[in-house]
Amino acid sequence: MIYVTAEQMRQIDHYTIHEIGIPSIVLMENAKAQISKHILDKNFSKAYVFASVGNNGGDGLAVARDIYNAKKYVKVYVIGKLEKASTDFKINYDILKKLDVEIEFVDENTKFDITENDLIVDSIFGTGLKRDIEGIYKGVIDMINDSQAFVVSVDMPSGLDSDENKIHNVAVKADLLVTLQLPKKSLQDYEGEYVVEPIGIPEKSIKHVLNNAS
């Protein structure tokens, strides 16, 4: 099995989008479908999606749409400022707003009421994280870990470095990790349950980057 670094995955994504011509929003829709199938086969009362405003969060918002379409209760908690959001995050955010999905921006006064019968989607940090997690982000991750809900992480458990088996101060303890297209390098030592799901990145993109790796 091939394990890739965060930088290699970034280059693979970039080549796919800018050289092959597959729009990033198409890859996000593909990711959504692959993640959602591991969620919608679970029994849960309510689903809570925790999302940053980058593309990892955009994946989470897209998954929230699938949960909504399955006629299950879903609420989205956004950590971060909308004006700093990625383009694909904003697209999915606007869709959820038009569907009247409940969205709350997290601050220090936010209260959570999550039970052991619920499911959490962790789409806060993906492969690009290289700094220690502090403040509201740390508080949210601590809350997720203290909950008894079933936790599904998107691409990487938030807080776990994707290149080295180390934690950036705190990390989500996922019951299931759905990592996208290729396993990340640190997963060679990962002890939790994870699956690797394709999102439509052509083999040509992968070979182009890995064959040119120094």
Swiss-Prot record:
<keyword id="KW-0630">Potassium</keyword>
<keyword id="KW-0547">Nucleotide-binding</keyword>
<feature type="binding site">
    <location>
        <position position="56"/>
    </location>
    <ligand>
        <name>K(+)</name>
    </ligand>
</feature>
<comment type="similarity">
    <text>Belongs to the NnrE/AIBP family.</text>
</comment>
<dbReference type="GO" id="GO:0000166">
    <property type="term" value="F:nucleotide binding"/>
</dbReference>
<comment type="function">
    <text>Catalyzes the epimerization of the S- and R-forms of NAD(P)HX, a damaged form of NAD(P)H that is a result of enzymatic or heat-dependent hydration. This is a prerequisite for the S-specific NAD(P)H-hydrate dehydratase to allow the repair of both epimers of NAD(P)HX.</text>
</comment>
<dbReference type="Pfam" id="PF03853">
    <property type="entry name" value="YjeF_N"/>
</dbReference>
<keyword id="KW-0479">Metal-binding</keyword>
<feature type="binding site">
    <location>
        <position position="137"/>
    </location>
    <ligand>
        <name>(6S)-NADPHX</name>
    </ligand>
</feature>
<keyword id="KW-0520">NAD</keyword>
<keyword id="KW-0521">NADP</keyword>
<feature type="binding site">
    <location>
        <position position="122"/>
    </location>
    <ligand>
        <name>K(+)</name>
    </ligand>
</feature>
<feature type="binding site">
    <location>
        <begin position="126"/>
        <end position="132"/>
    </location>
    <ligand>
        <name>(6S)-NADPHX</name>
    </ligand>
</feature>
<dbReference type="InterPro" id="IPR036652">
    <property type="entry name" value="YjeF_N_dom_sf"/>
</dbReference>
<keyword id="KW-0413">Isomerase</keyword>
<feature type="binding site">
    <location>
        <position position="158"/>
    </location>
    <ligand>
        <name>K(+)</name>
    </ligand>
</feature>
<feature type="binding site">
    <location>
        <begin position="55"/>
        <end position="59"/>
    </location>
    <ligand>
        <name>(6S)-NADPHX</name>
    </ligand>
</feature>
<dbReference type="InterPro" id="IPR004443">
    <property type="entry name" value="YjeF_N_dom"/>
</dbReference>
<feature type="domain" description="YjeF N-terminal">
    <location>
        <begin position="9"/>
        <end position="207"/>
    </location>
</feature>
<dbReference type="GO" id="GO:0052856">
    <property type="term" value="F:NAD(P)HX epimerase activity"/>
</dbReference>
<dbReference type="GO" id="GO:0046872">
    <property type="term" value="F:metal ion binding"/>
</dbReference>
<protein>
    <recommendedName>
        <fullName>NAD(P)H-hydrate epimerase</fullName>
        <ecNumber>5.1.99.6</ecNumber>
    </recommendedName>
</protein>
<feature type="binding site">
    <location>
        <position position="155"/>
    </location>
    <ligand>
        <name>(6S)-NADPHX</name>
    </ligand>
</feature>
